[in-house]
Amino acid sequence: MADKKSPLIAVSVGEASGDLLGAHLIRAIRKRCPQARFTGIGGELMKAEGFESLYDQERLAVRGFVEVVRRLPEILRIRRGLVRDLLSLKPDVFVGIDAPDFNLGVAEKLKRSGIPTVHYVSPSVWAWRRERVGKIVHQVNRVLCLFPMEPQLYLDAGGRAEFVGHPMAQLMPLEDDRETARQTLGVDAGIPVFALLPGSRVSEIDYMAPVFFQTALLLLERYPAARFLLPAATEATKRRLAEVLQRPEFAGLPLTVIDRQSETVCRAADAVLVTSGTATLEVALCKRPMVISYKISPLTYAYVKRKIKVPHVGLPNILLGKEAVPELLQSEAKPEKLAAALADWYEHPDKVAALQQDFRALHLLLKKDTADLAARAVLEEAGC
């Protein structure tokens, strides 16, 4: 293992949201330990912070049971390779960020060899597969939780866990500023604007983008001056979006695909259509009304539905304990229903104002110095 003044910190992420968390974590660790070095699996944002990625993070960005099965041989090959590489490099600590099905297996093998392990972002054990808690406690030395209801589950099982807040709540301003967002993006102040967030993975684009674009066409019939904004999380998703938009049915759709900038896009919008996942929380922290949707393979959906233990799938609804925003999933994810739900938000500003009060309270609950708290915990495990 490295000199504690220049610790080697291994990090592994599976998708765009993890890449963002990883980049913030690296920055916060460097403030406390400027000579720290980083390796593992990371995306473009982490690489921009000087991270050395041993494998292509995009190859891990798959969703759904059926989709994972198709790619399982490659995913297992990458995991075996990462474990082999890290056992050779002997990092001072391993941090798995989200992607629990991949990262916890890596952590378990490294912990067994004496390498301290941290899992950053608790799996949704409060929602489904709660029996995993005991196994996670065995696999990692410490869990860093983004939501306040999570640590007690691990403490009750004899593990170590702490609530570090959510990094988006820390980084995003409490106050709303639609005018500045529209100026930044060059969008007229007086027209209807809808944001489309079909997902950060290519597999999500395949399922959701056609439905979202069909929804946009219906909204355009209702609001001819409307514009649509779509933030592309990665170059891979941007390429796939371009392919979908080339279909004749979407010709002339007034849609602008923007590199990343999802927060600015959401703030510029009157309402947002979003695929279920971390992005729903970002929309809530932007204080924007939304409609949550999701479509996966029927087999995956049947499996998930049997296992899930909470009445909602969207993070804002789960955290608020009520259906504050509509969820139109699977067979309900039809363009007609999605368009009607978005129009309902656009045409009822009184409902939007009440929702924004709920979202402000949620923002205050989750707001902590997340990156610094996480960095402190990681360096403590590394013995620094």
Curated annotation (Swiss-Prot):
Entry keywords, A to Z: Glycosyltransferase, Lipid A biosynthesis, Lipid biosynthesis, Lipid metabolism, Transferase
TM stretches of this protein: none
GO biological process, one term: lipid A biosynthetic process
Entry keyword Lipid metabolism: yes
GO molecular function list: lipid-A-disaccharide synthase activity; phospholipid binding
Catalytic reaction list: a lipid X + a UDP-2-N,3-O-bis[(3R)-3-hydroxyacyl]-alpha-D-glucosamine = a lipid A disaccharide + UDP + H(+)
Record GO cellular component, one term: membrane
EC number: 2.4.1.182
Statement: the UniProt record of this protein carries the keyword Lipid biosynthesis: yes
Biochemical pathway: Bacterial outer membrane biogenesis; LPS lipid A biosynthesis
Top-level taxon of the source organism: Bacteria
Family: Belongs to the LpxB family.
Alphabetized NCBIfam families for the sequence: lpxB
Task of the protein: Condensation of UDP-2,3-diacylglucosamine and 2,3-diacylglucosamine-1-phosphate to form lipid A disaccharide, a precursor of lipid A, a phosphorylated glycolipid that anchors the lipopolysaccharide to the outer membrane of the cell.
Protein name in UniProt: Lipid-A-disaccharide synthase
Species the sequence originates in: Neisseria meningitidis serogroup B (strain ATCC BAA-335 / MC58)
